[in-house]
């Protein structure tokens, strides 16, 4: 759903109205942080309204934006050229979001910024894709063998 500042209750209503066959729900680990206005996190509120628990990876690799983006890129095309992520042509929202994902321009002499720009619209689809892939296929710490010369 592409709406700015969508309240969790409205999101739940929209999802339930579509009558999706939901197997799992993946979300932002920050969704479990308590909101003072309701006394619970958005993930807890989502579960209370829909009955579906929100799966969030809490390890440092999955919480890292850069690691998560790298993980998604590996699904888009691995080093050997294999594509493991296929997006249906009817999913126009996520396609638009992926095409609109941007990074800040690098200025000579300044630090390179690794985090993407957040426009509050296109970044949500990309973030949700990252949460889903990191939740379903967790990032594993890679061990490399180094041969001595």
Region roles according to the model:
Residues 1-117, 137-140, 144-149:
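Mg2+-dependent endonuclease catalytic cores in nucleic-acid-processing enzymes, primarily RNase H-like
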Residues 117-140:
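Acidic, Mg2+-coordinating catalytic module of metal-dependent nucleases/exonucleases
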């Amino acid at each position: 759903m592409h709406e700015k500042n969508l309240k969790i209750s409205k999101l739940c209503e929209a999802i339930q109205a579509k009558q999706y066959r939901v197997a799992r729900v993946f979300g932002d680990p920050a969704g479990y942080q308590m909101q003072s206005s309701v006394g619970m996190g958005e993930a807890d509120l989502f579960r209370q309204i829909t009955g579906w628990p929100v799966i969030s990876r809490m390890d440092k690799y999955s919480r890292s934006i850069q690691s998560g983006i790298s993980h998604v890129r590996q699904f888009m095309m691995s080093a050997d050229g294999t594509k493991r992520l296929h997006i249906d042509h009817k999913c126009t929202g996520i396609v638009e979001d992926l095409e609109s994902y941007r990074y800040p321009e690098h200025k000579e002499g300044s630090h390179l910024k690794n985090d993407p720009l957040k426009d509050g619209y296109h970044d949500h689809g990309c973030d949700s894709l990252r949460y889903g892939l990191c939740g379903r296929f967790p990032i594993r710490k890679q061990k490399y063998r180094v041969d001595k010369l």
